[in-house]
């Protein structure tokens, strides 16, 4: 059953096109990884899916309801941006409790999530003293505080210590009951996590493959190169075939 529908979505920045006519669907419980070079449009697309930026064209729906203009639909989304965007003067627990109150969630859930991300013993410490990896884990816990149906995570593995890498990867792999979209440059971890791989190039969705079709992360790179060659050969007027 289709949970997330992205139809003809584009984002223009003056004369520059950041995302160009992207369409795809995602089922509940399915994990998609956005793969592409720097500047491919991954973060721009995630920001529109998170309702942090409005599409210039196109429509995004969740369970059939339009995302734009609906606070109730937006509340079904959890977001972890590349920047942690935490209140550094507050403790990890206080950051989570603040977010819980904003969503009308019982604050007792905060300690459970701190344990989930491996920070149960650090909840009373100010975030200002945390490493980047620890802050990223707090951000993930915050994004899950209201039990969202869709989790969006921009570059979950970048610049993290090994403990944080393992913990975040483990949490993401455990989220089997909700839709997840991850943008990452970590091909090996992204490949292990994905049900689907969405290939972006110059703002366009040039391919969509099932991870089960790809024998390894190296095969993922080969498939991306193949899609890019098809796109170049067909020019701006054509779209390569989409593998289901």
Model-derived features: where do they sit?
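Conserved ABC ATPase "signature" region
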Residues: 97, 101, 107-122
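The feature captures the beta-strand-to-loop junction immediately N-terminal to the Walker
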Residues: 35-37
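Conserved ABC transporter NBD signature motif
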Residues: 58-69, 73
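Helix-to-loop junction immediately C-terminal to a conserved catalytic motif
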Residues: 50
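Catalytic Walker B motif of ABC-type/P-loop ATPase nucleotide-binding domains
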Residues: 151-155
């Amino acid at each position: 059953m289709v949970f997330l529908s992205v139809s003809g979505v584009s984002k223009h920045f003056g004369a520059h096109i950041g995302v160009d006519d992207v369409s795809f669907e995602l089922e509940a419980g399915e994990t998609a990884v956005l793969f592409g070079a720097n500047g491919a449009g991954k973060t721009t697309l995630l920001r529109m899916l998170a309702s942090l930026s409005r599409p210039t064209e196109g429509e995004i729906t969740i369970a059939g309801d339009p995302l734009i203009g609906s606070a109730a639909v937006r509340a079904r989304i959890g977001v972890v941006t590349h920047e942690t965007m935490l209140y550094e003067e507050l403790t990890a627990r206080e950051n989570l409790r603040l977010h819980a109150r904003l969503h009308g969630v019982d604050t007792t859930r905060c300690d459970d999530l701190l344990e989930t991300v491996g920070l149960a013993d650090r909840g009373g410490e100010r975030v200002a003293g945390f490493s980047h990896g620890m802050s990223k884990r707090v951000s993930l816990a915050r994004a899950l505080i209201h039990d969202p149906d869709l989790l969006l995570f921009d570059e979950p593995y970048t610049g993290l210590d090994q403990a944080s890498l393992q913990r975040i990867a483990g949490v993401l792999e455990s989220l089997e009951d909700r839709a997840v979209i991850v943008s990452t440059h970590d091909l090996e971890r992204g490949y292990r996590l994905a049900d689907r791989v969405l290939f972006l190039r110059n703002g366009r969705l040039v391919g969509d493959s099932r991870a089960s079709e790809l024998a390894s992360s190296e095969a993922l790179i080969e498939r991306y190169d193949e899609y890019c060659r098809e796109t170049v050969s067909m020019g701006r007027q054509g779209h390569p075939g989409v593998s289901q």
